[in-house]
Amino acid sequence: MGNGVQPLDPVAIQIGSISVKWYGVIIASAVVIALLLALSEANKRKMDKEIIVDLLIWAIPISIISARIYYVIFEWDFYKNNLGEIVKIWHGGIAIYGALIGAVLTAVIFSRIKKISFWKLADVVAPSLIIAQAIGRWGNFMNQEAHGAETTRAFLEGLHLPEFIINQMYIDGAYYQPTFLYESLWNVLGFIVLLIIRRTKIRSGELFLSYVIWYSFGRFFIEGMRTDSLMWGDFRVSQVLSLLLIVLSIGLIIYRRVKMNPPYYMEDKLGKVAKKK
């Protein structure tokens, strides 16, 4: 690479012709950490830990598939002429919002089958989801993707970033905004916020909805900085969806408080569908 800057090797392990990329290692690590956190939270909420494990067994593959389908739909102009590329997710091209949609649908169906409260289940996994997203963005970093517009080395140095991040943002002869880092840090902060508000007098389901609001708010602004956004006409898909999710989540919080009177978060411990008070 020009300018004497070398990117980090995206391959973590090479055994003969088989290579394991850092992207996969980081995503797998994010899943494991999310599982451990969810199990810990389930224990505090008096929920059977096997429920969390069973949910993830279904949610992980479905989320990966839905994330890929979401991406392919909005990049169909490319994939319609390259059908073989659709299954090659190691080439990149999965969308977090697609994964979130798949995970929520899986949890809704799963909670009905297991006869437990969807909202309680969603609250338990909310902190895990946002920290997993924070970790997962470093997979994008290793692949030199999900970056922002072109910038200068001086600007990156002005952010007091470590040298390895600055060098990794040097792509095809230019430096780029590390939007992956902005989102990762936003999610870490969101994780801390969720841990704080779960100790307040929020209602069942509101921890998850707070996660959706927090993530969507940050994603709306960060998405505007990216150069690889999925587009719907003249609109960035993730920005449109972010606004819709913020409005929907706030609306659900208000509606459920007024019409359903859900139990307080820390009182909903039985793992069964919460009844109205």
Curated annotation (Swiss-Prot):
Topology with regard to the membrane?
A: Multi-pass membrane protein
Q: What's a single GO MF annotation on this record?
A: phosphatidylglycerol-prolipoprotein diacylglyceryl transferase activity
Part of which pathway? Protein modification; lipoprotein biosynthesis (diacylglyceryl transfer)
Transmembrane ranges, per UniProt, are 18-38, 51-71, 89-109, 116-136, 177-197, 205-225, 235-255
List this protein's GO terms for biological process: lipoprotein biosynthetic process
Describe its function.
Catalyzes the transfer of the diacylglyceryl group from phosphatidylglycerol to the sulfhydryl group of the N-terminal cysteine of a prolipoprotein, the first step in the formation of mature lipoproteins.
Enumerate the PANTHER family for this protein: PHOSPHATIDYLGLYCEROL--PROLIPOPROTEIN DIACYLGLYCERYL TRANSFERASE, PROLIPOPROTEIN DIACYLGLYCERYL TRANSFERASE
**What name is this protein filed under?**
Phosphatidylglycerol--prolipoprotein diacylglyceryl transferase
The organism's taxonomy opens as: Bacteria, Bacillati, Bacillota, Bacilli, Bacillales
